[in-house]
Amino acid sequence: MSAIIELKKVTFNYHKDQEKPTLDGVSFHVKQGEWLSIIGHNGSGKSTTIRLIDGLLEPESGSVIVDGDLLTITNVWEIRHKIGMVFQNPDNQFVGATVEDDVAFGLENKGIAHEDIKERVNHALELVGMQNFKEKEPARLSGGQKQRVAIAGAVAMKPKIIILDEATSMLDPKGRLELIKTIKNIRDDYQLTVISITHDLDEVALSDRVLVMKDGQVESTSTPEQLFARGDELLQLGLDIPFTTSVVQMLQEEGYPVDYGYLTEKELENQLCQLISKM
């Protein structure tokens, strides 16, 4: 599958007198239809990277290629039409008096016909389970509902790429998991490419690949399973250790023959059943 996003040796500084560049020769690609999670400590360059992809910042050197086109000042608006952004705080994203108005806002700015806008808004709200709230004021929604509306606003624009900048970080665990599953379903149904900046293990686990950033560089790229198998190193990368990984480590220390690496809860359950049956 071809790459829809590619960064080649991208360097960026916010200030000319910086001791270290914010991004230092960053190179990676994202395949069409892929879900890539980007993790790393604060200041590692995660948010700067996605702002370069969306054309909000311009690299000092290197190139950013989106959907086959080199991102330049002349085509930046064309590129942005292909990208939907959802940020951490949903309250900063609302501009409409009602949910319906808010989702329609971007479409109206593009000059889309009224009937098409109505159809797109209804479809987008249905995808995120918010069709019964379209007459509500955004201020009266819960945090999870607000983020669903923000995602609907992005999806209604029919982008090829959705970027989530810690979009689930302000939600409670239940709301976070529900939102992640909603995004996954939309991604699977419409073959959208998803990039998520996150510290959430559930979000990382649903990714196809994980890119780890450290000090403005790409530290590694791997599958979620390979990442979780790094054990205690995860703490240094800004992630918690998954519950199943902790259990596996504990069993191994006690001498039990459990497979090394990350296991889902179901896989761990199966291994424990096998161990018990041999006792």
UniProtKB/Swiss-Prot annotation:
InterPro entries cross-referenced by the UniProt entry: AAA+_ATPase, ABC_transporter-like_ATP-bd, ABC_transporter-like_CS, ABC_transpr_CbiO/EcfA_su, ECF_ABC_transporter_ATP-bd, EcfA_1, P-loop_NTPase
Alphabetized UniProt keyword annotations: ATP-binding, Cell membrane, Membrane, Nucleotide-binding, Translocase, Transport
Keyword ATP-binding belongs to the record: yes
Pfam family, one: ABC_tran
EC top class named in words: translocase
Domain spans labelled ABC transporter: 5-240
Main location: membrane
GO CC annotation: ATP-binding cassette (ABC) transporter complex
Compartments where found: Cell membrane
UniProt GO MF annotations: ATP binding; ATP hydrolysis activity; ATPase-coupled transmembrane transporter activity
Positions bound to ATP: G40, H41, N42, G43, S44, G45, K46, S47
UniProt topology in membrane: Peripheral membrane protein
Record text on subunit structure and interactions: Forms a stable energy-coupling factor (ECF) transporter complex composed of 2 membrane-embedded substrate-binding proteins (S component), 2 ATP-binding proteins (A component) and 2 transmembrane proteins (T component).
Full protein name: Energy-coupling factor transporter ATP-binding protein EcfA1
Naturally occurring in which organism (per UniProt): Streptococcus pyogenes serotype M12 (strain MGAS2096)
Highest classification ranks of the organism: Bacteria, Bacillati, Bacillota, Bacilli, Lactobacillales
Name of the gene: ecfA1
